[in-house]
Amino acid sequence: MMLIATDPSTGEVVREVPAATPGEVDTTLAAAEAARSAWRDRGLDGRAEVLHAVAADLRARADELAPLMTQEMGKPISEALGEVEKAAWCAEHYAEHAAAYLATEDIASDATRSYVQHLPLGTVLGVLPWNAPFWLALRFAAPALMAGNTAVLKHDPHVPGCAEAIGDVFARALSASGAPQGVFLNLPLETADVAGVIRDRRVQAVSFTGSSRGGSAVASVAAAEIKPAVLELGGSDPCVVLADADLDAAADTIALSRIINAGQSCIAAKRIIVEDAVHDALVDRLRDRLAALKVGDPRDPATQVGPIARADLRENLHRQVTQTVQAGARLLLGGELPDGPGWFYPPTLLDDVTDDMTAACEETFGPVMAVLRARDADAALTAANATDYGLAASVWTTPERGEAMARHIAAGQVSVNGIVKTDPRLPSGGVKRSGYGRELGPHGIKEFVNVQQVWVGPRQG
């Protein structure tokens, strides 16, 4: 079985990598298990040495790593370079802050001393998607490794070159520091083979990023094996714009949020819920900004919107747009399949969308913006929560009003007057069908530790 990477800007196959055989899977898991004791005993300073080396290697090789993303999943080169830097920052952040995050906590009780310490679980499997190959790998691996676990990366089969390159970065860092290679290993697999790896006794936990359907499948297997899982799943993120918002700033940020990575982001603003009083003014601004975007070759540094990653994804996106227009939404921009090679899709603006239309009910994974009207702030809040998803949200209003509204939005993170983004310093994750558990920040590193309570009685004798 081959894992095949296709350039989405041309439709041409650019790489074929053999999937791991059952024997190679066994060898990989055995190596990860064998490395656990040495990695755990290396201590935080020794682990930090490796993560700092990973960060340095990512930065030194950014010009060769970033084009892999552009080639295999169509990310514009300017964004790809930014992603490599963000991945390096994540490694660096946990190298510098894991000791504080994992510090032993003394807790008063009837003991002479009682405390909580954070111990590694063992080997953590990361099952990751294609849309941010380097960032998501480091988001998973950096905290897991700094907590003393070993990590096995099962990346999306459409980005095998990225996965190999990530494995090589870690291999160099581990070799230079004298750590076992089994601390971090790349495992090229088809999606159908993941369940067997989760069931393996040598895997203690799993981190999954991807669709709600995929997350449900992973959660079912992990639950049957009584293994912890963190799920970061899809989102249909609301962006609420109230009458007292700065419309120019809101339009700039909303347009940027929706077209980063050609709109293929779980935390992008997808449902723009606008108070009636400023609806027309905001829509005019959004249309102007989307119309001015440069769509084209992702290798061109001037390109702002690249292709959709796969043909089937573009077909599904166009279906969502078509069904929404057929249901009564107004198509103000885009919405047509372009001629020529590759899987491009134009920035698309849909107005007068209602919460029962396809573009509001389903997650749209592409540069498609759906605008919904709300008569007032209460109606906007109701619309924001009218979804099965709960990953992220944003609110444009006064800071005080935005913070008050955030408490009533069912989402794992809310940005007030700013773009929703992931940050190594801050936890992120979802509720409802957007998953459970948290990535990043002090909360993320504690997802894959044994929070061990120790109770010490008086000295005997």
Feature names for model-found ranges:
Residues R36, R40, A55-A62, A66, ...:
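Structural signal for hydrophobic packing residues in well-ordered secondary-structure cores
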Residues G11, R47, M69, A91, ...:
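Residue-level signal for inorganic ion chemistry
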Residues I107-A249, A374:
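Rossmann-like NAD(P) dinucleotide-binding subdomain of oxidoreductase/dehydrogenase enzymes
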Residues M1-T112:
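N-terminal Rossmann-like NAD(P)+-binding subdomain of aldehyde/semialdehyde dehydrogenases
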